[in-house]
């Protein structure tokens, strides 16, 4: 309905001087679609009429009162659990206040990006704040609880991203960057966490521009001085001091068996990059027939094994464009980092939102990539331990925890996200608990 309505509205919205006859052409099999469309059109007219009456009676100020009437304090806690997980639909501050001290082995979460998004129409929502200062005032109730429930020596891994401030909102006429990640660092340090550093996760500037329109090629050609760069994501690492700081080992260390976890594997994990063969750049002739996934794979292998050459990088991308192989919806040949603290190989499309789309369910606004969560859990927890996400979303963190032999705990305020997450947690538990052929033979 929204798409059809917008298309119709555009016909007479922009200074139309003559009458317009509108014909809706549909097949006999589409009769129900037409019926539904006309029903929604009638509902739209009724809504416009009511809103017009409200404005006439109360003025524009009355709309704020109407919005306030639609917002409420969350007070309908629900809890579901399995053998390996527990998911709670409630305010995370209230839940953390009831948890035992030193009961969580690892915290992995993606906090709301200040007031950038609101996930629920409740006063409890962390996104329902006027400013960064107000957001962190609300966080002041949660962060001390995370410090209390985390075991000594263990980590809180906080996924954040700097925020884009658009020129039409700031009055600057151009987008600028709000250093939200830096504010987050000082917030957690204020509450006693020790800052251990940050992991940088490269983002796709082409995809980002499709969402924000701030790095457009046409605008850059007009004046490159107003252009910034893409915003990477960060995982900020904070540690609760152990009881004994003489050697700073955690009270319950995260240990690795050298027979199972080799030096070679550690070096690869520490560098956060996967080396593979592919010692030649894809030829321009091969490029004509190769799929973009193959081109991308070979390009990244080549970049990791050779000294970076900017002109060669640009030339290769331009050849892709000539052959019609350069996508406009994602970056095919993004820069490959050789730095150990930058993760440039995260599969950005590998989130639980992919499953949400396949099942035609509501997508999460800011999905957390599975790759990031898996690496953090494997690196900073032992098998069988409890991994907690206070901003659970659709259950990414407990889902990964179960898959990796841990236990998962999450809280989430949005009922739809929480409910969708239950199916993923049950699915993960069923997979790891399913008996193998050898188990059945033993029976």
Spans of model-derived segments:
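Short, conserved catalytic or adaptor-binding loops enriched in Gly and charged residues
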Residues: 14-15, 74-82, 335
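Short alpha-helix adjacent to the SAM-binding motif of class I
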Residues: 6-7, 36, 416-427
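Short, conserved SAM-binding/catalytic segment
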Residues: 76-82, 422-438
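Core catalytic lobe of class I
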Residues: 83-420
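Short, hinge-like loop/turn segments at secondary-structure boundaries
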Residues: 39-42, 175-176, 214-216, 426-429
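A conserved SF2-helicase RecA2
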Residues: 2-8, 12-73
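Short, flexible loop/turn segments with low-complexity composition
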Residues: 50-58, 249-253, 432-441
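Conserved SAM/SAH-binding loop
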Residues: 90-94, 437-442
């Amino acid at each position: 309905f929204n798409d059809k309505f917008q298309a119709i509205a555009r016909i007479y919205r922009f200074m139309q001087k003559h009458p317009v006859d509108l014909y809706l052409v549909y097949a006999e099999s589409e009769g129900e679609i037409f019926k539904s469309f006309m029903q929604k059109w009638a509902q739209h007219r009724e809504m416009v009429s009511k809103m017009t009456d409200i404005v006439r009676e109360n003025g524009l100020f009355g709309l704020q009162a109407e919005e306030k009437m639609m917002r409420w304090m969350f007070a309908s806690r629900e809890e579901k659990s399995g053998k390996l997980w527990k998911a709670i639909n409630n305010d995370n501050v209230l839940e953390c206040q009831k948890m035992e001290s030193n009961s969580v082995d690892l915290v992995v979460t993606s906090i709301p990006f200040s007031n950038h998004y609101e996930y629920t129409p409740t006063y409890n929502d962390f996104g329902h704040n006027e400013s960064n200062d107000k957001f962190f005032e609300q966080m002041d109730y949660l962060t001390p609880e995370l410090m209390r429930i985390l075991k000594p020596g263990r980590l809180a891994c906080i996924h954040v991203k700097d925020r884009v401030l658009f020129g039409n909102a700031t009055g600057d006429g151009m987008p600028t960057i709000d250093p939200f990640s830096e504010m987050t660092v000082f917030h957690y340090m204020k509450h006693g966490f020790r800052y251990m550093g940050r992991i940088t996760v490269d983002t796709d500037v082409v995809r980002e521009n499709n969402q924000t329109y701030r790095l457009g090629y046409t605008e850059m050609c007009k004046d490159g001085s107003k252009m910034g760069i893409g915003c990477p994501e960060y995982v900020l690492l904070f540690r609760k001091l152990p009881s004994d700081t003489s050697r700073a080992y955690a009270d319950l260390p995260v240990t690795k068996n050298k027979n199972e976890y080799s030096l070679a594997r550690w070096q690869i994990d520490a560098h956060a990059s996967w080396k593979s063969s592919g010692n030649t750049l894809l030829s321009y002739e091969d490029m004509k027939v190769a799929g973009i996934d193959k081109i991308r794979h070979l390009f990244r292998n080549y970049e990791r094994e050779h000294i970076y050459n900017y002109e060669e990088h640009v030339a290769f991308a331009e050849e892709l464009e000539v052959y019609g192989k350069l996508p406009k919806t994602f970056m095919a040949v993004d820069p490959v980092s050789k730095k150990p603290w930058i993760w440039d190989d995260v599969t950005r499309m590998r989130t639980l939102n992919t499953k949400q789309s396949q099942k035609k369910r509501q997508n999460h606004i800011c999905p957390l990539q599975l790759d990031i969560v898996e690496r953090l859990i494997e690196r900073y927890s032992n098998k069988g331990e409890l991994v907690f996400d206070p901003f659970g979303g659709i259950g990414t963190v407990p889902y990964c925890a179960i898959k990796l032999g841990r236990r998962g705990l999450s809280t989430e305020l949005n009922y739809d996200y929480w409910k969708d997450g239950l199916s993923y947690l049950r699915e993960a538990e069923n997979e790891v608990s399913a008996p193998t052929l050898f188990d059945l033979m033993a029976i």
